[in-house]
Amino acid sequence: MLASSQMTSVSEEKPIGGSLPAVSTDALEDSASSYSLHSQASLVGPRKSGTRTLEEPLLAPLQPLSCNTPMWACRLRSCEKIGDSYRGYCVSETELESVLTFHKQQTQTVWGTRQSPSPAKPATRLMWKSQYVPYDGIPFVNAGSRAVVMECQYGPRRKGFQLKKISEQESRSCHLYKATCPARIYIKKVQKFPDYRVPTDPQIDRKTIRMEQEKAFTMLKKNLVDAGGVLRWYVQLPTQQAHQYHEPETPGVPLSPSPFPMSPLEEEEAIIRDENCVLPSRLHPQVAHKIQELVSQGVGQVYAVRKQLRKFVERELFKPDEVPERHNLSFFPTVNDIKNHIHEVQKSLQTGDVVYNSEIIPATLQWTTDSGNILRETVTVTFAEGNLLKEPITSKMGTSQTQTSLSPEPLPLLSPLSSFQPKIFTHLQALKLQPRLSSPDGSQALVSVNSHPSSSPPGLDTAGNAEANNHSLLLGQSQNLGTDTCLPENSSTASPMGSLPESVQNLVAVDQLVGGEDAEDAGNLEGNVKRTLLGDAHTIPIHILDSHPALVEEDTLSMNQVKQEPNEPTLSTEAKTLLDCKNVSAT
């Protein structure tokens, strides 16, 4: 009653400040639209009489209500149905208490205050709508820092000493997750300024309405202290359908004077909800099905599910101009609602009612070529010393021959790798390697390959000046695929290796074996086979790349660092270069 008397005094003091209507009328006289002037002029006459006319009568609802609307909802001004709740406003605390008491009596529910406004400094931010206040063309400021939130007695448990004891007991007894009731009551107190109302007719140009809104805000900022205004309490009350996971109480008073039949639209919604939902829910059936789909795909985080639901509602269910407001809990569920639904779907997955769908991957988790985040995979190859110091070392890293097409045997080996790097393994049917190294007589500079599992072949004699204690790097494959040799034994490229046995005659052309700084030394090979001399056990990291312009998009590896022994006497004459292999074709 005290607040009601204060509100009456505020409203009755407004006629004293007669300068406010004059300022508003003069400011709006220059406007091209005349409707703002008429709305302001209609408020000038009653102010001189000294009676309170700013309190609005019981207005018609924003949308027609059905016959089964509860009596407590009919007491709200401008009442509208939002999901399983009804929202309207009251103009006094007495009216608000009356509606809340009537609602509790008819629903037989007990509520606890979860959140209450704090006595902070008065708000000065002008708004046209908010999460709790719909748009009606009247600007307002919040009269409290926060809204009043009341939860059902079967709602979520809150932090406290008793909660710690209960959580310890449940952890010891391996108690399962218990879903809680999501029903809530929201109360928001605001201060409206009907003197600065703008039209809400959809036929009026939006640009004109925006200009009027800017004018109203400008005048309100200048006269906010003397503007007065009307206090309103916007209330959102849930129905019995909003209560879940507990037995409903038997109402002592009937919800309506007579049992009216349900409308066809409501009956259809009820049938769809019963058929598609795992359990009774206030969520829209398509939203509940989306949660089930996300959880079955492995998305179980609450906020990740909420983000996907918002995108689903705003982009798929509705057009941009028809998206419901965020306070419609049927399409924008709370965190508690999402937790409950995730838990129900997880239980269904365990019992086998819902099958886990691992084939469908969400679009946000799929790697595409436009994402730019290319995964780099590292393979470490260790070159170890042989049994004899004077024998070369053969390291086997794959067999890639200069063929026009890939043989069918390596395809099963490449298929699992293609799932990790789709950009690299897109052209498996056109395996072609272009050699960069060439001998002076036009033949290719080749690297010797030992295709047999023996790790100690006879020593190589290249150009007659290779010493016996040098270790040559031979690229090969531990599993010989049985493909034919690249070049005949009597070819020009095999002539420098006449002393090699037949087991070492398999030759492989290497694409970009030597870096840019080593290209000049490539011409000094004089038909000799390129060799890399290694010491005792060097580890070479190999990275998979796909940004090089001359990259062969098969199984390609890159040697970033190759160490050489500085003590070898023949390094300065035969193997002086550092190998920086951008691409080495390996299977």
UniProtKB/Swiss-Prot annotation:
Q: Where are the transmembrane segments?
A: none
Q: What is its main location?
A: nucleus
* Gene Ontology BP annotations: cellular response to calcium ion; positive regulation of transcription by RNA polymerase II; regulation of transcription by RNA polymerase II
Taxonomic superkingdom: Eukaryota
Q: Where in the cell is it found?
A: Nucleus
In the record, what terms sit under GO molecular function?
Answer: DNA binding; DNA-binding transcription activator activity, RNA polymerase II-specific; DNA-binding transcription factor activity, RNA polymerase II-specific; RNA polymerase II cis-regulatory region sequence-specific DNA binding
Q: Which Pfam families match?
A: ALS2CR8
Ranges annotated as biased composition (Polar residues): 1-10, 437-452
Q: Where is this region: Disordered?
A: 1-23, 437-466, 479-499
Per UniProt, the keywords (alphabetical) are:
Activator, DNA-binding, Nucleus, Transcription, Transcription regulation
Q: Which cellular component, as a GO term, is one annotated location?
A: granular component
What does the comment on domains in this protein's record state? The N-terminus is necessary for DNA-binding. The C-terminus is necessary for transcriptional activation.
Q: What does this protein do?
A: Acts as a transcriptional activator that mediates the calcium- and neuron-selective induction of BDNF exon III transcription. Binds to the consensus calcium-response element CaRE1 5'-CTATTTCGAG-3' sequence.
PANTHER family documented for this protein = CALCIUM-RESPONSIVE TRANSCRIPTION FACTOR (PTHR14694:SF1)
Q: What is this protein called?
A: Calcium-responsive transcription factor
